[in-house]
């Protein structure tokens, strides 16, 4: 099965400016992400960036690069520009890997593409089980709730589902007994290329603005998203300088 990986790589990150070029074990971070994408078996890997320095570095290690606008409000808008510029066919499967995921397992890149191909949906993603109560109550850990067949009912930063008997008068998070219903969403997506173009035509919704989760726009507009349990749990992504040091330590130990 053929699929294309697009890696958005913004230079002007508010929390860690220039992070695509941050050195990790002698390579820029974006090169680590690119190499993981290649290992997934993708037929094509494209780095989408709004920065000439990132583009030059990416070309130096052999990556295909697509220059994009600096004015996009979301990563999905950047994907849509790439799809349009490169005339990618509407039925092509596109996997979106963030440019700050140097430790992403190649197996789950392939898995999310296979997930989309197996089901009659235009968008697919992955999740992992939540075993830690602190993670469950952490708003930075996005929760996802699905039906019995893996189709998404909702994404939220809140605890879903809400266990009324346990949580109503909860005083000690450590005493929570978690059921199998709790899933953390992993921010890797597969889409049909034509659907990406459709998505950016929809106006932002109240739900996504409240939760700050753009995937809610898809559900609001009546489209389905299928989620599977990831075959491998991805390690930390890089949002901050502290995250960068963690990733450096992990790779230095290997």
Swiss-Prot record:
It is found in: Cytoplasm. One of its GO terms (molecular function) is 3-deoxy-manno-octulosonate cytidylyltransferase activity. It holds the Pfam family CTP_transf_3. GO terms for cellular component: cytosol. This is 3-deoxy-manno-octulosonate cytidylyltransferase. Activates KDO (a required 8-carbon sugar) for incorporation into bacterial lipopolysaccharide in Gram-negative bacteria. PANTHER family: 3-DEOXY-MANNO-OCTULOSONATE CYTIDYLYLTRANSFERASE (PTHR42866), 3-DEOXY-MANNO-OCTULOSONATE CYTIDYLYLTRANSFERASE, MITOCHONDRIAL (PTHR42866:SF2). Belongs to the KdsB family. It comes from Haemophilus influenzae (strain ATCC 51907 / DSM 11121 / KW20 / Rd). It is an enzyme of class 2 (transferase). It catalyses: 3-deoxy-alpha-D-manno-oct-2-ulosonate + CTP = CMP-3-deoxy-beta-D-manno-octulosonate + diphosphate. It comes from the Bacteria. Pathway: Nucleotide-sugar biosynthesis; CMP-3-deoxy-D-manno-octulosonate biosynthesis; CMP-3-deoxy-D-manno-octulosonate from 3-deoxy-D-manno-octulosonate and CTP: step 1/1; Bacterial outer membrane biogenesis; lipopolysaccharide biosynthesis. Coiled coil: none annotated. GO terms for biological process: CMP-keto-3-deoxy-D-manno-octulosonic acid biosynthetic process; lipopolysaccharide biosynthetic process. Its EC number is 2.7.7.38.
